[in-house]
Swiss-Prot record:
Monomer. Binds 30S ribosomal subunits, but not 50S ribosomal subunits or 70S ribosomes. Belongs to the RbfA family. InterPro entries: KH_dom-like_a/b, RbfA, RbfA_dom_sf, Ribosome-bd_factorA_CS. This is Ribosome-binding factor A. It is found in: Cytoplasm.
Length: 138
């Protein structure tokens, strides 16, 4: 049986695809790098949409904040372009947010790899469970 998605999820999925193309094609500001739209959450009344995004190659908080500021200032233009592409009675207001889950996921992955490596070193340093301890008595 096919999964059933709510209307807001379908709108969010389409907005994610359309916004990715629009930003790449229409936004020529040099402060906007390679933006990836990771998710779009549309409110139930379809009045607002939170757009979660990451920027490749921009790691500092200042660069990311600048990109978000540029995208939020271009939100009206992007909304107008979305209205042309999507067949909706009203297009939601766009609010751009930085998606920290990607950075958090990479950090957790690095922590897990480090813990596994330390565990492997610890096991190599200890005696095998079948070996008998050497006696130091003479």
């Amino acid at each position: 049986m096919a999964k059933e998605y709510s209307r807001t999820q379908r709108i969010g999925d389409q907005m994610q695809r359309e916004l990715a193309q629009l930003i790449r094609r229409e936004i020529k500001d040099p402060r906007v790098g390679l933006v990836t739209i990771t998710a779009v959450d549309v409110s139930r009344d379809v009045g607002h949409a939170k757009i979660f995004m990451t920027v490749m190659g921009q790691d500092s908080a200042e660069e990311i904040a600048q990109t978000i500021k540029v995208l939020n200032s271009a939100a009206g233009f992007l909304r107008m372009q979305l209205a042309r592409e999507m067949k909706l009675r009203s297009v939601p207001q766009l609010h751009f947010h930085y998606d920290e889950s990607v950075v958090r996921g990479a950090h957790l992955s690095a922590l897990i790899e480090r813990a596994v490596a330390q565990d492997g070193q610890h096991q190599e340093g200890s005696a095998s469970p079948d070996a008998k301890p050497e006696s130091t008595e003479e």
